[in-house]
């Protein structure tokens, strides 16, 4: 049986390494239920990320534009701590937080150099969900 850890023993977590990256990519995935913002360096290594749920919203409030705004601000703040100044934005998905997230990235102090929509388009792939009857 392995020895039991002492109560009061320190836990060694992963230390955050400060990278100095001036330019990168911001990926905004906005679904009907949530918005996820990931900011990466030009090679694709994630520097910071945030989502509506991670920021503290639960349930149907995660899909609101305000929740997307808070998530984008949070991710931008963390990226700017690593020296990020300029981003290319890639937006994916049909959600309501798309434009709000882009605006809040700009408001947080990141310079948005380009915006492109990378929403995947099916060539008649999966059957879509049935119509809602309210």
From Swiss-Prot:
Record's keyword annotation contains Transport: no
Keyword Nucleotidyltransferase: no
Pfam families: Ribosomal_S11 (PF00411)
PANTHER family in UniProt: 40S RIBOSOMAL PROTEIN S14/30S RIBOSOMAL PROTEIN S11 (PTHR11759)
PROSITE patterns from the UniProt entry: RIBOSOMAL_S11
Subunit structure as annotated in this protein's UniProt entry: Part of the 30S ribosomal subunit. Interacts with proteins S7 and S18. Binds to IF-3.
Species classification: Bacteria, Bacillati, Actinomycetota, Actinomycetes, Mycobacteriales
Source organism of the structure: Corynebacterium efficiens (strain DSM 44549 / YS-314 / AJ 12310 / JCM 11189 / NBRC 100395)
GO biological process: translation
Region (Disordered): 114-134
Name of the protein this chain belongs to: Small ribosomal subunit protein uS11
Family classification: Belongs to the universal ribosomal protein uS11 family.
One Gene Ontology molecular-function label: rRNA binding
Chain's role: Located on the platform of the 30S subunit, it bridges several disparate RNA helices of the 16S rRNA. Forms part of the Shine-Dalgarno cleft in the 70S ribosome.
GO CC field: ribonucleoprotein complex; ribosome
Disulfide bonds: none
NCBIfam families per UniProt: PRK05309.1, uS11_bact
Keywords: Ribonucleoprotein, Ribosomal protein, RNA-binding, rRNA-binding
